[in-house]
């Protein structure tokens, strides 16, 4: 399954906006409150209302609320174009006094066989609460063996339900005697995907006593998954949930991670991630799940620098409140400093430090080399050492001082000749 485009009309802060999506990773970038998460909400709610039409999904349809309609307007409209089972679909969802859905093609001759297909396309949403463990609410559907289990609450604001993962794992172990090949494959898929993303974590397993939970070995020590850091737990929740659902949706695929199809919506993909992980998360996700399409929000210049131009959309607001989309921007391969300054409109340095750099440069422009050196020394003291900019300024001062000495020497020689 792959989303092609989304048009929002009178939805929250969007009077009219069209988003185009590419295969692989798509990033939505913008300041807080500009509407990045709203785009994901529009997608997950609209898709929840049409997935049961052409997939094995039996989950509850989500609703747009009256508060989602732009102030002063009578209704909102969400228009979607996507492809599933190699069939192009068009979907229009409106919400005024009630919901209305138009979905094409709508022939049962086309749709009924799709609902019973051996391989089911998914849409999975990950909210900013994905790393928060919870054990109280258990969805029994998630451990069932049918394909509809893959869709269970996939578009809700789920927390990390370790008990559900553990229950599903224990069910797979119980199936080893009945369908050894596929059950073993599914368990290996889950264990391998953890090590692929967190290579210091191995031997993922479920235990039923003294209570049902997930354990793994971290640097050789056995711990409960709840004891991982927020960043580790959030990443684990994402890849385990997606991998499990791909296994459930495609029970006959030998490698559901390689060949399973899904649209994956991730709010704040950089959530709790160390900068080193932010630098690698895009490549890891797209290589591990090559047939999945990702649509994610982020504030991280490191992640922006890993996404090629077709997949980057910057959302901004003009003074009159109208939302503007800048598409196909270049972020791939740029330094974080350039991304901060050129794409995110943010200074790459502390304001006081930058002001001191400006003072050094002003003294250089005025030819006040002694003053420039004094101000440079103040800068180095302020930063507790050198960086590239301080080294550049020092080199400029040295060069100008050398040039000044050479000019003075030539003037002396000219004076002696006279």
Describe the function of each predicted region.
Residues 1-54, 215-348:
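Switch/communication elements of ASCE P-loop NTPase nucleotide-binding domains
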Residues 6, 73-84, 90-92, 101, ...:
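Short polybasic amphipathic segments
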Residues 14, 83-86, 199, 220:
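Glycine-centered tight beta-turn/hairpin loop motif at sheet-sheet or coil-to-beta transitions
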Residues 29, 41-100, 104:
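Conserved P-loop NTP-binding catalytic core
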Residues 68-72, 110-121, 228, 304:
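A general structural signal for short secondary-structure junctions and capping/turn motifs
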Residues 96-195, 340, 355, 361:
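Coupling/switch segment of ABC-type P-loop NTPase heads
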Residues 113-115, 287, 302-418:
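RecA-like P-loop NTPase motor core
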Residues 149-259, 372:
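Extended helical coiled-coil dimerization/tether regions that scaffold
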């Amino acid at each position: 399954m792959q989303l092609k485009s989304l048009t929002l009309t009178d939805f929250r802060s969007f009077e009219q906006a069209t988003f185009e999506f590419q295969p692989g990773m798509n990033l939505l970038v913008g300041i807080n409150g500009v509407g990045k998460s709203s785009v994901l909400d529009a997608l997950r709610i609209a898709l929840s209302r049409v997935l049961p039409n052409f997939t094995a999904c039996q989950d509850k349809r989500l609703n747009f609320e009256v508060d989602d309609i732009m102030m002063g307007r009578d209704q909102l409209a969400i228009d979607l174009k996507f492809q599933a089972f190699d069939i192009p679909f068009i979907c229009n969802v409106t919400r005024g006094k009630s919901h209305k859905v138009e979905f094409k093609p709508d022939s049962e001759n086309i749709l009924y066989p799709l609902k019973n297909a051996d391989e089911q396309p998914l849409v999975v949403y990950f909210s900013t609460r994905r790393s928060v463990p919870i054990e109280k609410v258990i969805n029994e559907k998630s451990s069932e063996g049918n394909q509809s289990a893959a869709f269970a609450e996939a578009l809700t604001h789920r927390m990390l339900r370790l008990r559900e993962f553990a229950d599903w794992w224990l069910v797979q172990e119980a199936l080893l005697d009945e369908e050894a090949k596929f059950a073993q494959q599914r368990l290996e898929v889950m264990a391998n995907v953890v090590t692929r993303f967190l290579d210091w974590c191995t031997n993922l397993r479920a235990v039923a006593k003294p209570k049902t939970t997930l354990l793994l070995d971290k640097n050789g020590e056995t711990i409960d998954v709840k004891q991982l850091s927020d960043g580790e737990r959030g990443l684990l929740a994402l890849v385990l949930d997606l991998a499990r659902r791909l296994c459930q949706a495609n029970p006959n695929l030998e490698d559901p991670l390689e060949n399973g199809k899904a649209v994956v919506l991730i709010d704040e993909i950089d959530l709790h991630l160390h900068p080193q992980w932010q630098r690698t998360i895009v490549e890891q996700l797209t290589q591990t799940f090559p047939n999945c399409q990702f649509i994610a929000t982020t504030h991280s210049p490191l992640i922006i620098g890993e996404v090629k131009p077709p997949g980057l959309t910057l959302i901004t607001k003009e003074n009159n409140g109208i939302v503007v989309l800048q598409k196909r921007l270049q972020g791939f391969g740029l330094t974080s400093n350039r991304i901060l300054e050129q794409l995110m409109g943010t200074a790459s340095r502390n304001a006081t430090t930058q002001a001191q750099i400006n003072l050094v440069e002003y003294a250089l422009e005025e030819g006040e080399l002694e003053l420039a050196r004094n101000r440079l020394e103040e800068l180095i003291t302020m930063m507790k050492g050198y960086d590239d900019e301080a080294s550049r300024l020092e080199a400029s001062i040295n060069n100008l001082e050398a040039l000044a000495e050479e000019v003075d020497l030539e003037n002396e020689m000219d004076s002696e000749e006279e």
